[in-house]
Swiss-Prot record:
Disulfide bonds: none annotated. It catalyses: xyloglucan + H2O = xyloglucan oligosaccharides. PROSITE patterns: GH9_1 (PS60032), GH9_2 (PS00592), GH9_3 (PS00698), PROKAR_LIPOPROTEIN (PS51257). One of its GO terms (biological process) is symbiotic process benefiting host. Gut bacteria supply the human body with energy from dietary polysaccharides through glycosidases that are absent in the human genome. Xyloglucans are a ubiquitous family of highly branched plant cell wall polysaccharides present in the vegetables we consume. Enzymes involved in xyloglucan degradation mediate the conversion of otherwise indigestible plant polysaccharides to short-chain fatty acids. Belongs to the glycosyl hydrolase 9 (cellulase E) family. CDD domains: E_set_Cellulase_N. This is Xyloglucan-specific endo-beta-1,4-glucanase BoGH9A. Gene3D superfamilies: 1.50.10.10, Immunoglobulins. A lipid is attached at residue 20 (N-palmitoyl cysteine). It is found in: Cell outer membrane.
Length: 587
């Protein structure tokens, strides 16, 4: 990365009108890339200009018209793959809440400085799960123009031949209602559901005060339970129906044989099935049910008996997984043996040590049983990796590193070893971030861009850095977590705020059947799209092959413009954490 440094000059001007240096090169307004939602007063404030010919910039108060700041460019950096040179501007010295205008080289853009600036994002990201609910009408009083009729009651689901057992032979009718649509499609998947809830509930435990005050206008908002847990409960109820009551195994997914077209849920016609039980489904189920048993114990008034039921289900699922440690879900093999063939999302995984570690850890903290502690230590990771549905080691680590958790001496030593690996990861991630084209840990390697990268790499990297901050109190980790958030909100190569319904330039045509079929021009808000993907597996027309610009805002681009619950779980996790840390102390 070629870096040309300039001496930074910052000054607050008191009543003086200082003229801007004549433009070196006139640029369009959209060449200025910044966080389109705004900044907290004491947050680092960075903008990037899509030009290498910038020297001076000015900040004006948009209300009074007064010039409040003038600065020199911080540095220029050249992209490793697109050959573009960009300039970084730092205006962190501006801290007074208000609306401002940044002017540079003939271009200008407005931005906000305000308290709780990420609250609308955190709320919208969590509210997206309400829009994904199945089997119930999405009502106008909660959804506004995006209200719709109920679809997929799932009270007439068939046991697929791959899932048949003596007590439930193929063709048996079961009821498996509620739950969330997984992504742009209309199916429901245990692996992704378990991971998504596990990540969000891990964050919930860090900021109890924050989540107790959050209201997102869902049907349960007036009960005694925080809205986040209410929303999780809607999917947890469905997950419980996916457990075979006889042996404790968990069906991998509830699905149609093929993806439905872009039609309203109420117009879908395909028969739905539960398919093969899998070890990863059982363990993700066990982990999240054990975790939920602790969290919902305080809310018996709203959800009587759930905590006990969840823990019993968790232990039963874990026992099944121990008996079937190699029961991996392989859709190709399944289709060679059974009909109808299944062609929907696979969520295949041929390694279950991470799921065993996470499930055993959660069960240990929920039951105190030594056997689960021993299993967790036996399956513990040697290095830290950011969380993802295909690698849940981090969720187990988060359980061990929960602030305020009382651990005995041996457990503390084990937790400290996990903390060491987390910090090694965090230090590597932030190395050199302040010299990159977009002044962020994410986005500086072509390998950062792939299917779902904005959540699975950018957001989950940010979540990991936030945990590193909580473990150490070192601001450098938190600053870099904010930088990754700035990236998805506009400080990036395309200039998109990658969350629907937010910012000044956001996706209008996500690969999302609910949005595409509702006859409403604007997409349902609050969804993080997958992001730039040079793999371009969908065959859509992309304007460039450059890794960080390989994005197209079209409905057919499932490789770059789809939405998914696990991606939004990552958005909920980081947006809520950063907002909570700016407002509330950790409880």
């Amino acid at each position: 990365m070629k870096i040309v440094r300039y001496i930074a000059l910052f000054g607050i001007l008191s009543g003086l009108a200082v003229a801007c240096t004549p433009s070196t090169s006139v640029i369009p307004n959209d060449a200025i890339r910044l966080n389109q939602l705004g900044y907290y007063p004491n947050q680092e404030k960075i903008a990037v200009v899509d030009s290498g010919k910038v020297e001076e910039f000015v900040i004006w108060d948009a209300v009074s018209g007064e010039q409040v700041f003038v600065g020199k460019s911080l540095y220029t950096a050249k992209s490793a793959w697109s050959d573009k040179t960009r300039t970084t501007l730092d205006f962190s010295a501006v801290t007074t809440p208000g609306k401002y205008i940044l002017k540079v080289n003939g271009a200008s853009v407005t931005f906000l400085i305000k308290d709780s600036v990420l609250s609308p994002l955190a709320d919208a990201a969590l509210k997206s799960f309400y829009y994904q609910r199945t089997a119930m009408p999405i009502e106008e009083q909660y959804a506004g123009q995006w209200h719709r009729m109920a679809g997929h009651p799932d009270n007439h689901v068939l046991i697929h031949p791959s899932a048949a057992s003596p007590d439930r032979p193929a063709g048996t009718i079961v009821s498996s209602s509620k739950g969330w649509y997984d992504a742009g499609d209309y199916n429901k998947y245990i692996v992704n559901s378990g991971y998504s809830i596990g990540l969000m509930q891990s964050i919930y435990q860090l900021f109890l005060d924050y989540f107790s005050r959050q209201k997102i206008n869902i049907p349960e908002s007036n009960n005694h339970t925080p809205d986040l847990l209410d929303e999780m409960q809607f999917n947890l109820d469905w997950m419980l129906t996916m457990q075979d009551p006889e042996d404790g195994g968990v069906y991998h997914k509830l699905t149609t044989p093929f993806f439905e077209g872009f039609v309203k849920p109420v117009d879908c016609k395909q028969q739905r099935y539960v398919v093969q039980k899998s070890v990863t489904a059982a363990l993700d189920f066990a982990a999240v049910m054990a975790q939920s048993s602790r969290l919902f114990a305080s809310y018996e008034e709203d959800y009587p008996g759930f905590s006990k039921r969840a823990l019993l289900a968790a232990e039963k699922a874990y026992a099944w997984a121990e008996k079937h440690p190699e029961a991996y879900y392989n859709q190709n093999l399944l289709n060679q043996k059974y009909q109808p063939a299944i062609a929907t999302g696979e969520y295949g995984d041929t390694h279950a040590d991470d799921e065993f570690f996470w499930a055993a850890s959660e069960l240990y903290f929920s039951t105190g049983k030594e056997i689960y502690r021993e299993e967790a230590i036996k399956k513990a990771p040697q290095i830290y990796t950011a969380p993802g549905w295909g690698n849940t080691f981090a969720l187990g680590i988060f359980a061990w590193l929960q602030p305020g958790r009382e651990l005995n001496e041996a457990d503390r030593r084990f937790a400290d070893s996990l903390k060491t690996e987390l910090l090694k990861y965090a230090d590597k991630v932030i190395e050199g971030a302040e010299q990159t084209p977009f002044h962020a840990p994410y986005g500086n390697d072509a390998k950062d861009f792939f299917w779902g990268c904005l959540a699975e790499k950018c957001m989950n990297q940010g979540v990991s850095l936030m945990y590193a901050y909580l473990q150490t109190g070192k601001d450098v980790y938190l600053t870099n977590a904010y930088r990754n958030m700035d990236y998805i909100l506009g400080r990036n190569a395309t200039g998109f705020c990658y969350v629907t319904g937010l910012g000044t330039k956001s996706p209008k045509h996500p690969h999302h059947r609910l949005s595409a079929s509702d006859d409403i021009e604007d997409p349902i808000p609050g969804f993080l799209v997958g992001g730039p993907n040079p793999g371009q597996q969908d065959g859509a027309f992309y304007p460039t092959a450059s890794p960080d610009e390989s994005y197209v805002d079209t409905e057919d681009s499932y490789a770059s413009n789809e939405v998914a619950i696990n991606w939004n779980a990552a958005l909920v996790a980081l947006a809520s954490s950063l907002d909570a840390l700016a407002v509330y102390s950790v409880k």
